[in-house]
């Protein structure tokens, strides 16, 4: 989790598209969302979040292969505090492993 989220940013997720789509409903909580191919729009009152993703080649470390999903986040109509509040939940639901 970050202390601040810019209106537009990108990140790499260590998951497949199928995993991402399985986690997305819980990550956005009560916010309505709609998928369109490799993108989605999430209604985050009073604004919105546009997501775009693309599968990248996996990371290979010795015999381990980790999937890579490159995700673009574009917020509109939300201030810093509103973006932070949404992303705090989103990141907690998307977080895997750790330690």
Segments predicted by a language model, with ranges:
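A generic structural signal for short beta-strands and their flanking turns/coil linkers
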Residues: 7, 38, 47-49, 67-71
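A common structural junction motif
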Residues: 28-29, 91-98
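A short, structured beta-strand/loop element
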Residues: 46-65
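Short amphipathic alpha-helices in soluble, non-transmembrane regions
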Residues: 85-91
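Short, conserved charged micro-motifs
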Residues: 17-22, 79-85
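Short secondary-structure junctions
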Residues: 27-37
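Short beta-strand-to-loop capping motifs
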Residues: 11-15, 73-78
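Terminal, regulation- and interaction-focused segments at domain boundaries
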Residues: 1-27
